[in-house]
């Protein structure tokens, strides 16, 4: 009875303790600090440095690094220390959004930062040189999408048109470097197309396997690309400033992880089409987001996901549990058959199948649920990784501030290991020591080995596995009780039948003696 109580008690304590994480969190404000001519901006996912010298973006540092990712500086020519966040800049580097051309100002004045919304920050840089007045407005959001919106307002007070170039950076082609990609009419490539061969220029940027640094161009803009004598490729977009007019250009920079759903959300889905694995994950991610919107907490979303999964798989798991329990109870008979027919494997297999048929069990019945649950586990793992930004910005659960990162205290790792050991103990309650010794100890060692090698997996995955294993162990306990009760009833019936036969034999003997 103690076994049966331990599992629901652990699950109940987990649910009650998680109640504190039910409420949604308020929008997080963006922090900033003005240091000399620079302003440093910190969001939940990245760190930025803007400068009044050119009104440029000098650094985009991805400090949030979920499992399988690493911190990264995206601006060419900038190096960021992961510990101190101190920056070093290459001499002569071209920073994103520097404006070059006829009379473009080199120095700007930073206005007072404003907050259009609690989780937004608006920076405005104003510069003037001659007849050109330039205003650059950067809008940052504390969300999961790594975007910086830019509005460039060009006022030309002169009598001549001005040709301007808005640069995203410089690029030195070399092995292992990021790829320079242009997008025209929704198709990405490394070449700049002739003006007459496309309808719209969508943008330009740098891509590697993990990150994307891509500028969505303003409507009607044209690509810009120049190769310097040193071999550097300067790239960006061209802007027109007609005489006596004020023009406004709206652009958007995506500087973040290379994740299809994030990029699709900001209109860059065609830049990186998902593979088969990503397509399989999309429904799982969308379902998790649906549960999150219902509960406002990814911890509860994972709990509901686990419960729904266990309910759907209940018939299969029930059959698996019965099959495994019966198999354990048949071990003595199986061993006798194997010893008896060890010299004739064909006959041994025939006798084993006869025993399985007599007991009404299929030795392969336990495989199907395992084959179904493993892909679910893998898909959930990938879904948590691909939803890491949303999870990072959501409220914490229990002691876990971020379910996309590892458990800092390894509590879930230890609990899951203990529940797995308990489940293994429930699976081998009747096996004789000689038969089950190696199997039993292997079953106890495996959870420990798993914990040692996978301890740094996302806490959300450990939460799912803990709940799923706990529910499976509870279900196995109930199956063991059902089978034990059935065997007791069968044994009682057999004993009663035996007593009846003995009484019948005794009566026949008395009759014969009387005759």
Predicted regions and their residues:
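Helix-loop-helix
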Residues: 2, 11, 15-17, 21-23, ...
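Intrinsic disorder/low-complexity segments
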Residues: 18-27, 62, 66-69, 73, ...
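Intrinsically disordered, low-complexity regulatory regions of eukaryotic regulatory proteins
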Residues: 25, 200, 206, 503-506
